[in-house]
Regions:
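N-terminal domain-start interaction segment
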Residues: 1, 16, 79-83
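Negatively charged, low-complexity tracts enriched in Asp/Glu with abundant Ser/Thr
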Residues: 2-66
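Generic signal for short, ordered secondary-structure residues
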Residues: 9, 13, 101-105, 145-146
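Amphipathic protein-protein interaction modules
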Residues: 59-131
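Short, highly charged C-terminal tails/helix-capping segments
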Residues: 135-150
């Protein structure tokens, strides 16, 4: 079974490398830890500390790929909203020169305006090695106009 390195950065940890390094766990334990966080309480703390963020950082020790799920303190809705950032590379085709030329640019998979359940789904997909699925969701997300929490 694959193990994942888990770090959690709380709002009071303001240094760039400040985070609680909790160790290596299997995917089931990581999901339990994600569910165990009092996200509403973290949101209140973030707002009290002027937007310092809470991050749930998971690294696949085999591939070195990392995802960071960040609680968005300044969401436009009343619901919890998350962002997902990663170091997982993805090639994106972009049109230039009035749409006549297409070039590929390297980007990293990321998502904004995620609900807690959607963020957990993406976390599970990452831990199950479903990177191609995340890439497809990212590409699909790029082609959609912006909307509120999904």
């Amino acid at each position: 079974m694959n193990e994942f390195d888990l770090k959690i950065r709380y709002p009071h940890q303001t240094g760039r490398n400040d985070a609680d390094h909790l160790g290596a766990f299997d995917s089931e334990t990581i999901l339990k830890r994600f569910d165990a966080i009092a996200w509403r309480q973290q949101l209140v703390r973030q707002l009290q500390l002027d937007g310092a963020s809470t991050s749930f950082i998971v690294t696949d020790e085999r591939s070195g790929q990392t995802i960071r799920i960040i609680l968005d303190a300044f969401a436009k809705t009343q619901h919890l909203e998350f962002k997902l950032e990663s170091n997982i590379p993805v090639l994106i085709a972009k049109k230039d020169v009035f749409g006549l030329l297409t070039r590929k640019t390297k980007d990293s998979i990321s998502f904004k305006h995620l609900t807690q359940s959607r963020a957990k789904e993406y976390l599970l997909a990452f831990m199950n090695g479903e990177i191609a699925e995340l890439e497809a969701l990212y590409r699909e997300n790029l082609s959609k106009p912006m909307k509120s929490a999904s």
